[in-house]
Amino acid sequence: MEWGAVEIGGGGFVSGIVTGQREMYARTDVGGAYKYNYETDRWEQLLGFLNEEDRGFLSVDAIAIDPTDDDTVYLLCGCAYFSNARTVIFRTRDGGKTFDEIDVTSMIQVHGNGDGRQCGEAIAVDPDNPDIIYCGGDVNSGSSALIWSQDGGDTWEPVKGYDDLGYYTNSINWPTWDESHFVKSITDGAYNNQNGVATIAISDGKVYVGTSVTGKANVVVADVG
């Protein structure tokens, strides 16, 4: 087997590659998401339609492919210091030609250019029922760090019981933490790496949620639904 470099174009750190039955999608921390074109042997940008106001969504925190349909893909996007720290899920059902935008900022927030951005995909589709999708991020204290959809991403709601996985405050558009967490000092104040849901997987009717909570168990398992 021989390995070589593959051109992907300018756009930051490649933080994840997700494969379906055939299609391949890649995410970057500041340069959007890409789909591999087998005919041209190149990676093609999927989020080129974004304007300056929405540049924060070029920070792609996670990708999920519908296990039953490679053309149905979900991109979890957001950046702590651009686009008012909003978090959205872009959904395509035609392989990236068009996208629906679903804003989930009121429930979770993500920072696709933050530390730990390479630590897995924080969104997953149930292979037994692709209308069910789980998604995680950082949240306000006392809120659930895990949300889910039962209608293919049209609507989302918090999953009860996940309110201690991590939290987020956008007071300075960056996660800040209480004294129980390790804190570093920067010119703008104190901060810590993002804390909350880092990765999600669904298999055999179980949803596995990987977290990053200091001093606690970092994998939570529950029945889907």
Sequence positions of predicted segments:
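Extracellular glycan-interacting surfaces
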Residues: 1-225
